[in-house]
């Protein structure tokens, strides 16, 4: 029993076995009264513990740690007992601590003091058993607590592998890419006035399908009512659905309300292609040539307009599949074709001489009065004519002007047409259809004419710019190896601020 191993629990009062006085093998029980260290082996650094033991017969003797350990190993019973000694025993403990009791000396006690341990021996035995049970119970509880603590430790879950993390990143990137190419994100809100001045007007397409959700598709302005008008070339911007939050024009009668939903949800969103090729669907009906971006839209167009059926696609027999085909459009080539067009200035616009003979007599005074004004005001119509922006199939046949001038303005009593031949855009209007026509005042006519005629100079300004990559940049001037000499904009891959065109 080493004192350093029992720091919190004292051995004083423990019941041990010690050799008898006669030296035979029969051990005697005793209670440890004091502990001290023997300094005889101080030179070797090892110190033995010497225990003062109150023997069973009342005598007090000192035993070394080895003697008590040997006798305890041979003893049939191992137990520990807290000492509840009387005053005489505590006196013996005091004497043992003070070194007053030597080895082999017996402390003489009165007969009453020697009988008291014998009388209380039975009580001590019972208490020893209870103490041993309590000690065993405490040890078992301690072990259980340790097990509970070890089992209740939160073990972290297995971390995901790097492949799974990479797959999550790839999935997120695909979702973001699909969202960025969706019609809602790709097409910003465009006002009607901005649409008249925008670049999409140069493509020769008029709005032909409209739904309650506010999405438009664009097609060529040719229909059954206008069989002689050829289909103009397609443009790169003609297939993007535009969102019209406020639209003053009339809706299309032959397109149901599910057009926008089918455009968004019925078919997968097309991904951007690196080769700038777009798959479109063209109507093969005679003198139609309508082009839509979805198969569902072109089927609905053929079913409702040409076949005269108003039922849904579920009750259709599939006849409309024979009247459309897939076409691939290279948007880069269309953009190059538009960039090769020569700009036109409205200052040189003048009506052709053949139009003077076609004009009625009532407009001669108006024409003579407007001859002294500016060319822009000379091209504006008078208040006698009604301006309408109906769809192509709702309008009458426009007057075609075979002249070399890029702009022709043909006022008449029934209709007039303003057409840009390169690229062709036709605005047709009638005053005979009250259900689809919209009458405007003179102020609206004048502003609309200005909007129509002001787009060619804007196109001229955009076409006069240098194409991408022609201007000087820090990357071209200094090179990739001298990146520290670049301007801040070039470092962040923005437009160069040092070499401005």
From Swiss-Prot:
Residues 80-96 have a biased composition (Polar residues). Disulfide bonds: none annotated. Residues 80-138, 183-203, 216-267, 340-380, 398-419, 427-446, 453-472 are annotated as: Disordered. Residues 368-380 have a biased composition (Low complexity). InterPro entries: CR1/CR2-DNA-binding_regulator, DUF4772, Znf_C2H2_type. Residues 115-137 have a biased composition (Basic and acidic residues). GO terms for biological process: regulation of transcription by RNA polymerase II. It comes from the Eukaryota. A motif (CR1) lies at residues 472-476. A motif (CR2) lies at residues 490-494. Keywords: DNA-binding, Metal-binding, Nucleus, Transcription, Transcription regulation, Zinc, Zinc-finger. Its main location: nucleus. GO terms for cellular component: nucleus. One of its GO terms (molecular function) is DNA-binding transcription factor activity. The keyword Endoplasmic reticulum does not apply. The CR1 and CR2 motifs mediate sequence-specific DNA binding. This is Zinc finger protein 704. It comes from Danio rerio (Zebrafish). The lineage of its organism: Eukaryota, Metazoa, Chordata, Craniata, Vertebrata.
């Amino acid at each position: 029993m080493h004192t350093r191993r029992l720091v919190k629990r004292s051995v004083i009062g423990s019941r041990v076995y010690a050799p008898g006085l006669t030296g035979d093998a029969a051990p005697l029980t005793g209670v440890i009264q004091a502990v001290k260290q023997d300094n005889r082996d101080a030179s070797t650094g090892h110190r033995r513990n010497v225990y003062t033991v109150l023997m069973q017969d009342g005598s007090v003797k000192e035993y070394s740690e080895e003697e008590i350990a040997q006798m305890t190993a041979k003893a049939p019973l191992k137990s520990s007992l807290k000492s509840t000694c009387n005053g005489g025993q505590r006196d013996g403990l005091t004497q043992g601590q003070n070194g007053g009791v030597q080895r082999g000396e017996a402390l003489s006690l009165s007969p009453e003091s020697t009988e008291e341990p014998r009388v209380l021996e039975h009580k001590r035995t019972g208490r020893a058993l209870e103490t041993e049970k309590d000690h065993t119970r405490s040890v078992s509880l301690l072990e259980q607590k340790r097990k509970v603590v070890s089992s209740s430790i939160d073990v972290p879950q297995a971390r995901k592998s790097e492949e799974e993390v990479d797959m999550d990143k790839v999935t997120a990137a695909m979702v973001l890419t699909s969202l960025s190419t969706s019609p809602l994100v790709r097409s910003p809100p465009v006002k009607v006035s901005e649409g008249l001045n925008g670049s999409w007007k140069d493509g020769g397409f008029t709005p032909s399908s409209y739904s309650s959700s506010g999405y438009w598709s664009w097609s060529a302005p040719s229909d059954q009512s206008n069989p002689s008008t050829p289909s103009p070339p397609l443009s790169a911007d003609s297939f993007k659905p535009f969102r019209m939050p406020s639209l003053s024009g009339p809706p299309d009668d032959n397109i149901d309300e599910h057009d926008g939903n089918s455009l968004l949800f019925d078919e997968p969103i097309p991904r951007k292609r690196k080769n700038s090729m777009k798959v479109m669907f063209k109507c093969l009906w005679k003198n139609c040539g309508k082009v839509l971006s979805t198969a569902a839209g072109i089927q609905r167009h053929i079913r409702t307009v040409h076949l005269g059926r108003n039922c849904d696609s579920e009750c259709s027999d599939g006849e409309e599949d024979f009247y459309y085909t897939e076409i691939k459009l290279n948007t880069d080539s269309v953009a190059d074709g538009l960039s090769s067009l020569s700009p036109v200035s409205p200052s040189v616009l003048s009506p052709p001489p053949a139009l003077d003979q076609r004009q009625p007599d009532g407009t001669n005074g108006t024409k003579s009065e407007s001859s002294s004004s500016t060319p822009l005001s000379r091209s504006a119509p008078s208040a006698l004519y009604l301006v309408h922006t109906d769809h192509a199939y709702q309008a009458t046949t426009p007057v075609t002007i075979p002249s070399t001038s890029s702009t022709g303005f043909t006022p008449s009593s029934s209709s007039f047409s303003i057409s840009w031949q390169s690229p062709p855009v036709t605005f047709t209007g009638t005053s005979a259809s009250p259900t689809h026509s919209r009458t405007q005042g003179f102020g609206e006519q004048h502003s609309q004419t200005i909007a129509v005629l002001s787009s060619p100079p804007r196109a001229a300004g955009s076409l006069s710019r240098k194409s991408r990559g022609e201007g000087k940049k820090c990357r071209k001037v200094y090179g990739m190896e001298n990146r520290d000499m670049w301007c801040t904009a070039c470092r962040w891959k923005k437009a160069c601020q040092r070499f401005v065109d």
